[in-house]
């Protein structure tokens, strides 16, 4: 039989245990867990696979947290106090219902991994200081509603992994070419037709690099290069011919491809009542 939540809290306090795992316990409110916010010593808190809809401001009491995992809940909003977690390195908010991030979210000074996969976020959801998260090494934004990736992405120069799969992206900013430490770029399942020539600044064709771009309505010359392989795509977008064609394409300001309607089937779109039946 699994230990009660009360017992987990008591044990963590008595034995000074740094990690608390409360995953898959049917928890709908963190304030119901007696004593949780007195565990200021803990460095890791796992609350994945629960039924949380909000995170209380008290989260700031857990000031030594380095890992915070809320994967697969029903969280619709976060408190501004979350950004006071000065030691937080790894924050997993994947599979929730977020459509906005709180003001000041970008002032997490130690954050290295941020997972926002499978929410309802878009370019207007990000607070002004989001791209101050310059310590980020991995940013997961897949399965959201981004049509545009803000040019400030270029400020996240330590990024090694950027996942943008299954959004509604119609273009990538030239600033993506400033992410010279990038080892993985996932842009499959969007509405992209062209790539900025600046992407050619990156080395994503080696054996240890990953570049995934299928299921996009590429213009014919790029689609042809993909048939030959990723290294051919990068060679092509670095060419003067492509730079000229890209310039003309952008000037013509073509109508973006239509949205894919499959996205409305996302679980995070459904009303809560329907999901819990």
Curated annotation (Swiss-Prot):
Q: Where is the sequence biased in composition, kind Basic and acidic residues?
A: 7-23, 256-265
Decide whether keyword Acetylation is in the record. Answer: yes
Give residue ranges of the LRR repeats: 41-63, 64-85, 87-109, 110-133, 135-156, 158-179, 181-202
Q: Name one Pfam family in it.
A: LRR_1
SUPFAM superfamilies listed in its UniProt record: L domain-like (SSF52058)
Sorted UniProt keywords: Acetylation, Leucine-rich repeat, Repeat
Domain of life the protein comes from:
Eukaryota
| Any single GO CC term annotated in Swiss-Prot or TrEMBL for this entry | PML body
Provide the residue span(s) of the region labelled Disordered: 1-23, 250-277
Q: Which Gene3D superfamilies match?
A: Ribonuclease Inhibitor
On this chain, the residues bearing N-acetylserine are 2
Its job:
Potentially plays a role in the Ras signal transduction pathway. Capable of suppressing v-Ras transformation in vitro.
Q: What is this protein called?
A: Ras suppressor protein 1
Gene encoding the protein: RSU1
């Amino acid at each position: 039989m699994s230990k009660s939540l009360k017992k987990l809290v008591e044990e963590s306090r008595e034995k000074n245990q740094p990690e608390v795992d409360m995953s898959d316990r049917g928890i709908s409110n963190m304030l119901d867990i007696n004593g949780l916010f007195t565990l200021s010593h803990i460095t890791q808190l796992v609350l994945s696979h629960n039924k949380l809809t909000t995170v209380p401001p008290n989260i700031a009491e857990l000031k030594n947290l380095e890992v915070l995992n809320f994967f697969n809940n029903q969280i619709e909003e976060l408190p501004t106090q979350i950004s006071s977690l000065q030691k937080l390195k790894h924050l997993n908010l994947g599979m929730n219902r977020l459509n906005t991030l709180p003001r000041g979210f970008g002032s997490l000074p130690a954050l290295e991994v941020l997972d926002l996969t499978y929410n309802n976020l878009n370019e207007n959801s990000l607070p002004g200081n989001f791209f101050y998260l310059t310590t980020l090494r991995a940013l997961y934004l897949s399965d959201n509603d981004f049509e545009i990736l803000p040019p400030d992405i270029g400020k996240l120069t330590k990024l090694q992994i950027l996942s943008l799969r299954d959004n509604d992206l119609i273009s990538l900013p030239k600033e993506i070419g400033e992410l010279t430490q990038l080892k993985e770029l996932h842009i499959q399942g969007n509405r992209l037709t062209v790539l900025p020539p600046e992407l050619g600044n990156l080395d994503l064709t080696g054996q240890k690099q990953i570049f995934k771009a299928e299921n996009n309505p590429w213009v014919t010359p790029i689609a042809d290069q993909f048939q030959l392989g990723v290294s051919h795509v990068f060679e092509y977008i670095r060419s003067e011919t492509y730079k000229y064609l890209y310039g003309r394409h952008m000037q013509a300001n073509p109508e973006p491809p239509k949205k894919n309607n499959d996205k409305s089937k996302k679980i995070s779109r459904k009303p809560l009542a329907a999901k819990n039946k």
